[in-house]
Amino acid sequence: MNPYRIDEPTAISFSGGRTSAFMLYKCLEAHDGQLPDEAVVTFANTGKEMPETLDFVQACADNWGVDIVWLEARVRRGGEEENKYVYETVEVSHATASRKGEPFTQLIEAKVYAPNPLARFCTKELKVDRIKDYMRVYHDWWTSYIGIRADERRRAVKIHNKSDGSQDQYCPLYADGVTKEHVYDFWINQNFDLQLPNNNGTTDWGNCDLCFLKGKSKRLSIIRERP
């Protein structure tokens, strides 16, 4: 059975990196270049991604002829209570996407503290919940395709083939035995690529620019190169 075949409502979660882009390519390949109507590709922008990441998402759409739904959070004060905040999901595009951290800044103002390894609310509020909001408009239940590789087993086993209460979670790259070496080999042979360093299939510059999950030395290196 092809692990990339889709026959039910599915959200292909595209983070903007090479691995999830490879997952998207394999899904397209499994359907002769045209995703079924049940599938939607989503990219949740936090405003803290590198400009190259946003360009890469658009390049994938253009080169592969696939529609990608760009989503962002809007967090604003709402109601009469002083500390009441409303969380909304809006569609944007490559042209209109936030590039100065606006969604992230709004979230921090609402929470009044920064995310950290013990409270990763940034991922939940800015990415996961935004995709769920969008999917709930069309479906009561769906499967979420997540780009976690076979060499990321500790991450994969926590969510692969598991439900979180509103969606089934599935990691096709993990199921297919794909490693970062496969991702590297794929991208060095394409006519376009993410314009960030390719360190054997991974990059220190991916996802949010100064994410706390990146080591201190990596964050300092990024700051030195782009003050």
Model-based region annotation:
Residues 1-227:
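Nucleotide-activated chemistry modules centered on ATP-dependent adenylation/adenylyltransferase
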